[in-house]
């Protein structure tokens, strides 16, 4: 359930267990904790931009998801395998059902990623990691019945709500 808010918020993010202010002008959080919990109940997460490099968020966060029981599908055209799992060139190439698409690519790439999401009939949620936002793409996804989370870390929210 979405809770409408009257004014922009100052959003905070947990980084290494500390709270750091992350003001985002004009951004109003629309994802309630109940909605986030519902999304986090899904099983299969395709990670667009999944990295082979330990120490990078695009590697360590998907690794965390694997370690916490999620079926992670790496999407990276420059890798054959990540975490012992087949890496796919694009969402279009993934033969398995996908519940969540977790994006670790620049905001400018979100519309193209969303096009691939909309070509599938199985994606229930589009999750854009910290500093990744695209209001037009989010609107298109929501109009198609897909939940959207922007500018939030899936790992941080999992830890906070678990």
Q: Residue spans of the language-model regions?
A:
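Extreme N-terminal basic, low-complexity initiation segments
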Residues: 1-11
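Hydrophobic, well-ordered beta-alpha structural blocks that scaffold small-molecule cofactor pockets
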Residues: 15-78, 83
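Glycine-rich, highly charged phosphate/nucleotide-binding loops
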Residues: 27-31, 81-96, 102-112
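Short, acidic/turn-prone active-site loops that include or flank metal/cofactor-
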Residues: 79, 130-133, 152-156
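Structural motif
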Residues: 99-100, 125
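Active-site capping/gating segments
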Residues: 147-162
């Amino acid at each position: 359930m979405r809770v409408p808010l009257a004014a922009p918020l100052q959003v905070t993010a947990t980084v290494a267990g500390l709270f750091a202010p992350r003001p985002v002008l004009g951004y109003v959080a629309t994802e309630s904790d109940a909605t986030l919990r519902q999304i986090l109940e899904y099983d299969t997460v395709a990670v667009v931009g999944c990295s082979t490099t330990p120490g990078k968020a695009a590697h360590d966060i998907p690794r965390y998801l694997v370690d916490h029981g999620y079926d992670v599908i790496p999407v990276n055209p420059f890798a054959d395998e990540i975490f012992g799992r087949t890496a796919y060139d694009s969402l279009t190439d993934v033969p398995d059902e996908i519940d969540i698409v977790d994006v670790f690519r620049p905001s400018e790439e979100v519309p193209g990623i969303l096009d691939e999401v909309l070509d599938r009939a199985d994606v229930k949620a589009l999750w854009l990691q910290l500093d990744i936002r695209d209001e037009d793409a989010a609107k298109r996804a929501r109009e198609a019945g897909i939940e959207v989370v922007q500018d939030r870390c899936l790992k941080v929210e999992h830890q906070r709500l678990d």
